[in-house]
Amino acid sequence: MLSGKKAAAAAAAAAAAATGTEAGPGTAGGSENGSEVAAQPAGLSGPAEVGPGAVGERTPRKKEPPRASPPGGLAEPPGSAGPQAGPTVVPGSATPMETGIAETPEGRRTSRRKRAKVEYREMDESLANLSEDEYYSEEERNAKAEKEKKLPPPPPQAPPEEENESEPEEPSGVEGAAFQSRLPHDRMTSQEAACFPDIISGPQQTQKVFLFIRNRTLQLWLDNPKIQLTFEATLQQLEAPYNSDTVLVHRVHSYLERHGLINFGIYKRIKPLPTKKTGKVIIIGSGVSGLAAARQLQSFGMDVTLLEARDRVGGRVATFRKGNYVADLGAMVVTGLGGNPMAVVSKQVNMELAKIKQKCPLYEANGQAVPKEKDEMVEQEFNRLLEATSYLSHQLDFNVLNNKPVSLGQALEVVIQLQEKHVKDEQIEHWKKIVKTQEELKELLNKMVNLKEKIKELHQQYKEASEVKPPRDITAEFLVKSKHRDLTALCKEYDELAETQGKLEEKLQELEANPPSDVYLSSRDRQILDWHFANLEFANATPLSTLSLKHWDQDDDFEFTGSHLTVRNGYSCVPVALAEGLDIKLNTAVRQVRYTASGCEVIAVNTRSTSQTFIYKCDAVLCTLPLGVLKQQPPAVQFVPPLPEWKTSAVQRMGFGNLNKVVLCFDRVFWDPSVNLFGHVGSTTASRGELFLFWNLYKAPILLALVAGEAAGIMENISDDVIVGRCLAILKGIFGSSAVPQPKETVVSRWRADPWARGSYSYVAAGSSGNDYDLMAQPITPGPSIPGAPQPIPRLFFAGEHTIRNYPATVHGALLSGLREAGRIADQFLGAMYTLPRQATPGVPAQQSPSM
């Protein structure tokens, strides 16, 4: 999880984001009905954010794919001299630390942990790199200049940080419809190949016809997702000759509908629901995944009941509402609309979406703003450290230490230690150069002293020889000339040595005047670096020491394009809308799930009167319990027979994180209203995640503070008054005591303590990988009740953000997992209507569609 991680747009998006991303599926026993958390007292234990890097926070950028050449000269295994760092971060230094790791165009502190799909980045990058002269024509520049002359001068103000408001260029038409549906426009997916074997094995032209029908059908749906797209309407609007093969059009339409690519969410039905229901399904939990699955199954003609332990729906999508105050306690960010199914839902529901501005000034513990140069320098080093850990993992295969998987936190500390060692090595090398130069100078001076004595002696001899009055004989004349020659040679040699002396003294002076840094990071630099680490811990909802070094950002390549947005009227509007018309039993906590070859039985209790027990019989159970509830010991829900070892092992290996929020409702705005985010730099590494980021997202004067990393768990054991007091102390340090009033309302989330969540969202723990998400998604088939009996069919299914490998920890991931399981269950019990030639009869298990 860089997200996750990245184009020029991502660079702009950088400051924004990891804040409570999307929410996961329901809760143990169902979520509540009205996803709002109405005026609750401070201390409300409400849903946490679900989603790695929810939009809006400066989410740390995720590492790029591994490269062939080592970044920063990090060519030796851990323990060696380490990355070749150049100048290091020192107090007052304005030069970025040069670890040698290439800088990327990634955005800083963005809610997107992940980068946008590469194939749609080129246009955006080229536009972002244009100068103003290149971007505007000469006429436009002249017109602009004339217009500016007529305008009155603006009032003086601090120059704002540049914000890149451009959106990545996305394909349009049928190609764009495939893109928005997360499908390749020019080839069949492996799932389509399995469902349409006659097409994939046929001629190329047949596949092209299939792809056009598929893409055009998607386009028709996306053009108007408020109304059901029927087969008849599709056939009528398909252009000739693609509408000639009605059987193929019907199969494609059925396939897209069954798998939640069209006719999903909240839309007006053209065809009424079948009066006779086929098959009974119990869904545990009314979070987004459970609600999405229920609506689909209901539209397919199945009898569906949701069991929700809370008194509202929505699960970890929970909105606090009181008067004019609105604030999301759980998921609150839409991480880009390009390819996001929430883009469709946002057209169906009144979601008031607003872009999150990425500017995010940092304030130190003393309340002073971090200088921009220092901020950028440390952030650059943070990105380089991540690059170095990627190189350690993917190129040097440094993933196991002492027979234990290496965490991202461990690797970062290793790289930092290597950099510190490198600094010491540079110091040693520097002093060696000084000593060597001094030795050379000493040796030179000794030579010069000896030479001077020789010159003195020779000069005396020359003087004496010269005093012989002429006429001198040949011997005497030769002696004078030879002494003169020797004296000239020695003087020349002395001059050369004197010149060398000057150079050595200059070199020595330069060495002594320019010592290398004696530290890799000053204490101030480390505090700012810890802020970035806290932001990364926020994006993943867990301390870095628990994240898998190799796989923490395995979902990076599936990040959606576009700006991150917040739902200003509260994210709970989505689950409330999805819940309309469904049979939901609130305050009903599931205690036991029995599944056999012949059917299932779910035993639940009333949460307000646990003596009241309910038994529900059904053909299949869809479990959308959060991973935190599945991990709970002793188990909150008993499965009979117990879940197989492969499933429980995946549950144990995967991580379920924690992230909390403090909502502060004021009577007036005392912060910069143009800024959506500002950060608070902690004074210690241990407290780096404590109230490290403040959000200003809503119309009312509300600030939302985040608590991440180790601090998220510690804070759950502290009273609301202490937490709110700490928030106010930080704000007064930044804005001044007189500027900060007492809040009118406060709410503190405690997601780990929430019995129906037990945390915020999943992460890839050390020892886990993306494969575990696939294992979590696999249904369970009970063993045959009688030896030799026909092989039973799956009865127990799983959905939720922890079951979708490519989009974990997000609301859209939860939604997609619900659509996936609804298709799987319907294929199993109603038959796959898009297959040829055999059609399964209702009620009779049909050939199973491939895993989605």
From Swiss-Prot:
GO cellular component: chromatin; chromosome, telomeric region; DNA repair complex; histone methyltransferase complex; nucleoplasm; nucleus; protein-containing complex; transcription regulator complex
Requisite cofactors: FAD
Compartments reported by the entry: Nucleus; Chromosome
Result of altering residue 503 to R: Loss of polyubiquitination
Location in chain, cross-link Glycyl lysine isopeptide (Lys-Gly) (interchain with G-Cter in ubiquitin): 503
Phosphothreonine sites (modified residues): 59, 104
Cross-link position per record: Glycyl lysine isopeptide (Lys-Gly) (interchain with G-Cter in SUMO2): 442, 469
Residues binding FAD, per UniProt: 289, 308, 310, 316, 332-333, 801, 810-811
Biased composition regions of type Low complexity, renumbered to the chain: 7-25
Annotated EC: 1.14.99.66
Pfam families, per the entry: Amino_oxidase (PF01593), SWIRM (PF04433)
Record-stated family: Belongs to the flavin monoamine oxidase family.
Function: Histone demethylase that can demethylate both 'Lys-4' (H3K4me) and 'Lys-9' (H3K9me) of histone H3, thereby acting as a coactivator or a corepressor, depending on the context. Acts by oxidizing the substrate by FAD to generate the corresponding imine that is subsequently hydrolyzed. Acts as a corepressor by mediating demethylation of H3K4me, a specific tag for epigenetic transcriptional activation. Demethylates both mono- (H3K4me1) and di-methylated (H3K4me2) H3K4me. May play a role in the repression of neuronal genes.
UniProt disease link: Cleft palate, psychomotor retardation, and distinctive facial features: A syndrome characterized by cleft palate, developmental delay, psychomotor retardation, and facial dysmorphic features including a prominent forehead, slightly arched eyebrows, elongated palpebral fissures, a wide nasal bridge, thin lips, and widely spaced teeth. Cleft palate is a congenital fissure of the soft and/or hard palate, due to faulty fusion.
Subunit structure: Component of a histone demethylase complex with RCOR1. Component of a RCOR/GFI/KDM1A/HDAC complex. Interacts directly with GFI1 and GFI1B. Interacts with INSM1 (via N-terminus). Component of a BHC histone deacetylase complex that contains HDAC1, HDAC2, HMG20B, KDM1A, RCOR1 and PHF21A. The BHC complex may also contain ZMYM2, ZNF217, ZMYM3, GSE1 and GTF2I. In the complex, RCOR1/CoREST strongly enhances the demethylase activity and protects it from the proteasome while PHF21A/BHC80 inhibits the demethylase activity. Interacts with the androgen receptor (AR).
Listed name of the protein: Lysine-specific histone demethylase 1A
